[in-house]
């Protein structure tokens, strides 16, 4: 009788040890699986959609452009020292900043929130009940750097005139795309794509921009 009771206690002890080892192994395996799981599975679905849209937005397009400084961000409300001019480009407009803001108060330190297209496009809304601009590209480079592209050798392109100049390196860009067609000012809502791409421009009186 005593032998049977000892055996029973011994078997129960082994069973408890086995359960403990199994539970520890299971937790370790679960931790290993979580460690190897891609982080994007924990992101909101809209973040994944934005990433996919950025990849899809890599195609060539003719668009509007505004040159801004790459280290500091110009406030969307322009001072009197800033001269802006618009050129008609195939039915759309291209805005050029001939002189950037000189006052220190006219700049904001680089911030991703400032790169939001809804913030940067705010200064473009001058009248209500007008069609929103469909596409707009902000070039975050020194104006002299962009201007120097016109000194590079001519290259063939699909823009009007067929002769263009290509930037020697990718430029820091913010691509703004209207979220839904048919919107009218002041209710213009844009998707924001921050990227680096080579630009191709014409350097005649009517400048055009192409993104590669």
From Swiss-Prot:
UniProt keyword list: Cell adhesion, Fertilization, Glycoprotein, Secreted, Signal
CDD domains (UniProt xref): RNase_A
Expression across tissues: Male-specific expression in proximal caput of the epididymis.
InterPro entries, A to Z: RNaseA, RNaseA-like_dom_sf, RNaseA_domain
SUPFAM superfamilies, sorted: RNase A-like
SMART domains: RNAse_Pc
Glycosylation sites: 129, 204
Segments traversing the membrane: none
Post-translational modification: The N-terminus is blocked. Glycosylated.
Chief location: secreted
Signal peptide bounds: 1-24
Gene3D superfamilies referenced in this protein's UniProt entry, alphabetically: Ribonuclease A-like domain
GO terms classed as biological process: defense response to Gram-positive bacterium; epithelial cell morphogenesis; heterotypic cell-cell adhesion; male gonad development; positive regulation of cell-cell adhesion; positive regulation of flagellated sperm motility; regulation of fertilization; seminiferous tubule development
UniProt subcellular location: Secreted
Intrachain disulfide bonds: none
Any single Gene Ontology cellular-component annotation: extracellular region
Record has Secreted as a keyword: yes
MF annotations from Gene Ontology: nucleic acid binding
Family of this protein: Belongs to the pancreatic ribonuclease family.
Function: Secreted proximal epididymal protein required for post-testicular sperm maturation and male fertility. May be involved in sperm adhesion to the egg zona pellucida. Does not have ribonuclease activity.
Name of this protein: Inactive ribonuclease-like protein 10
Lineage, highest ranks first: Eukaryota, Metazoa, Chordata, Craniata, Vertebrata
């Amino acid at each position: 009788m005593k032998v049977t009771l000892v055996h029973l206690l011994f078997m129960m002890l082994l069973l408890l040890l086995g359960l403990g080892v199994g539970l520890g192994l299971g937790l370790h395996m679960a931790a290993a699986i979580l460690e190897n799981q891609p982080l994007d599975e924990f992101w909101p679905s809209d973040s994944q959609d934005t990433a996919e849209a950025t990849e899809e937005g890599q195609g060539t397009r003719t668009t509007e452009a505004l040159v801004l400084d790459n280290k500091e961000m110009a406030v969307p409300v322009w001072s009197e020292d800033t001269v802006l001019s618009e050129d008609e480009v195939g039915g759309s407009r291209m805005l050029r900043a001939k002189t950037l803001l000189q006052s220190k108060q006219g700049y904001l330190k680089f911030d991703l929130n400032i790169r939001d297209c809804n913030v940067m496009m705010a200064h473009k809304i001058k009248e209500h009940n007008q069609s929103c601009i469909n596409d707009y590209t902000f070039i975050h480079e020194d104006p002299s750097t962009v201007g120097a592209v016109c000194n590079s050798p001519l290259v063939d392109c699909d823009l009007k005139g067929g002769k263009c100049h290509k930037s020697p390196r990718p430029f820091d860009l913010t691509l703004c795309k209207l979220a839904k067609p048919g919107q009218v000012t002041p209710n213009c809502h844009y998707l924001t794509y921050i990227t680096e791409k080579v630009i191709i421009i014409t350097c005649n009186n009517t400048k055009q921009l192409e993104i590669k």
